[in-house]
């Protein structure tokens, strides 16, 4: 399945993108690495599902009014998903009624 994704990315990169330039539509990518390189690297590092998700997020950021510059593929441990343990969640802590009453009626 990765080979199909890589084939489509290479087809765009070397076929369609080059054809656009011959028609005079010069679209220079705002980021480094380019979006097609980013997608290829994301699929290699994270697999098809997470890689295509990261690729879609990148394509949504790539517009004329967006940011530009260095935008590497995140490492596996940093996918933007932060999880908390149930015990550490602030709403899961048990507080006795006497303690709450003590705070209100000092």
UniProtKB/Swiss-Prot annotation:
InterPro entries: Membr_insert_effic_factor_YidD. This is Putative membrane protein insertion efficiency factor. It comes from the Bacteria. HAMAP family: UPF0161_YidD (MF_00386). Keywords: Cell inner membrane, Cell membrane, Membrane. One of its GO terms (cellular component) is plasma membrane. Belongs to the UPF0161 family. Could be involved in insertion of integral membrane proteins into the membrane. It is a peripheral membrane protein. It is found in: Cell inner membrane.
């Amino acid at each position: 399945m990765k080979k199909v994704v890589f084939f489509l990315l290479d087809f765009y990169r070397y076929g369609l993108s080059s054809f656009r330039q011959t028609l005079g539509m010069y679209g220079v990518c705002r980021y480094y690495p380019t979006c097609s390189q980013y997608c290829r690297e994301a699929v290699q590092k994270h697999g098809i599902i997470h890689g295509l998700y990261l690729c879609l997020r990148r394509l949504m950021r790539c517009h004329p009014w967006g940011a530009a510059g260095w935008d590497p593929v995140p490492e596996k441990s940093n996918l933007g998903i932060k999880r908390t343990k149930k015990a550490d969640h602030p709403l899961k802590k048990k507080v006795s009624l006497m303690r709450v009453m003590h705070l209100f009626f000092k």
